[in-house]
Amino acid sequence: MYVGAIHRVSDPEGFTKAEDEAIAAGLPDGISLPIHAATHDHGVGICIWEGPSVEAVSELVESVVGPFSQNEYFEMTVDGLP
């Protein structure tokens, strides 16, 4: 399933560092991040995740970037991805 996440970032430096470290360490089996994008000032991020459930994705994301942002999650239908 695809899960959309909107991040309203309060600490862009902390968010970016935490995200980069988590991606470098490797995501858990069954979860991938095919699309991630941010505004130029990194105040807002929009990601499309693939995972087993909204809960699984939100638990992972909150554990990594929760201290640096307020996050919303939605089950999504996505065109253009396998």
Positions of PLM-derived features:
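Short S/T/G/P-rich N-terminal loop/turn motif that feeds into the first structured element of a domain
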Residues: 1-82
